[in-house]
Amino acid sequence: MGNSPSYNPPAGISPSDWLNLLQSAQRLNPRPSPSDFTDLKNYIHWFHKTQKKPWTFTSGGPASCPPGKFGRVPLVLATLNEVLSNDEGAPGASAPEEQPPPYDPPAVLPIISEGNRNRHRAWALRELQDIKKEIENKAPGSQVWIQTLRLAILQADPTPADLEQLCQYIASPVDQTAHMTSLTAAIAAEAANTLQGFNPKMGTLTQQSAQPNAGDLRSQYQNLWLQAWKNLPTRPSVQPWSTIVQGPAESYVEFVNRLQISLADNLPDGVPKEPIIDSLSYANANKECQQILQGRGLVAAPVGQKLQACAHWAPKTKQPAILVHTPGPKMPGPRQPAPKRPPPGPCYRCLKEGHWARDCPTKTTGPPPGPCPICKDPSHWKRDCPTLKSKN
């Protein structure tokens, strides 16, 4: 932005203190050059390296800068010391005697009228992009948010129309509406207390501060515009509608319902929601629903027709594998003995029926039917012959 360096602070200084130094540098006369900002950055590096601690307003006064080494940095420090030590220069700051020591100076510099304001210029697109980049991750109304906008205002001296353009570029529609409500209330309260240089007969504060010779009146409007950011009402965090995407297993009806709820919470009344819903209901749908809408030619159709097309869509779920036991060949078990066949007649040993001769009870108890064929002894069987045992 102009001759200003990046708002990101160098090593050795907090973002708030760095923005305060940049605001003080903007009040140099003649106006600051790129070399002034380079000297300011080199001074911070030197202070952090030599003092072994971060730069602060209390530790880095005008006496901390060696004369002649860093250009006009001593003048920047003197301006900062004068503004932060002046009770009237810091709106909302209490007098030192009303606070217990030590007295902490205000962390945000006010906009100071610099006499004839002939520095006004319209925003360039690159300036708006730089401002948005610096505060895109900051909460609206936070200290760094306000200080960054304050420094941008110092460099361009914007009119109410320029500030409205800036608001539309950096803030969401909901924050724009809340800020406008807060600004309108602040202007009404200040008008009742008679703004310096404000004449109700010549129009509203917005109209009068837009005039080329508005002077202090424009500065007061700019202060009110910044103050309105601090008074934004708190609201519950709602998921931005642009980040709502249909999940792979989420039904299309539930996805569209979440999208409609987010738009209702984020967009102010009067802003048409149908074009956004019609666009995002296809762009943020999952691939399967997009294929259905493409096949039916409903990419740019209203959301109602898309709901009818995808109402019965269901995600394809993978069925778990089921292990089925298939009977195989039977393994052979223990061999069962064959049923005994009854003998055809009486046992030839005992002449009784019902058993075979091999199972005859008299086989082991009775005398052998004849002499042993080996030793001719009639008292034992052949298997019990002593001659066989002696040979073994």
Swiss-Prot record:
Gene3D superfamilies: 1.10.1200.30, Human Immunodeficiency Virus Type 1 Capsid Protein, Zinc finger, CCHC-type. It holds the Pfam family Gag_p19. InterPro entries: D_retro_matrix, Gag_p24_C, Primate_lentivir_Gag_pol-like, Retrov_capsid_C, Retrov_capsid_N, Retrovr_matrix, Znf_CCHC, Znf_CCHC_sf. GO terms for molecular function: nucleic acid binding; structural constituent of virion; zinc ion binding. One of its GO terms (cellular component) is viral nucleocapsid. PROSITE patterns: ZF_CCHC (PS50158). Sequence repeats lie at residues 342-362, 367-387. A motif (PPXY motif) lies at residues 100-103. Keywords: Capsid protein, Host-virus interaction, Lipoprotein, Metal-binding, Myristate, Phosphoprotein, Repeat, Viral budding, Viral budding via the host ESCRT complexes, Viral matrix protein, Viral nucleoprotein, Viral release from host cell, Virion, Zinc, Zinc-finger. A lipid is attached at G2 (N-myristoyl glycine). The record marks L109, P110, L323, V324 as: Cleavage. One of its GO terms (biological process) is viral translational frameshifting. A zinc finger (CCHC-type) spans 345-362, 370-387. It comes from the Viruses. This is Gag polyprotein. It comes from Bovine leukemia virus (isolate Australian).
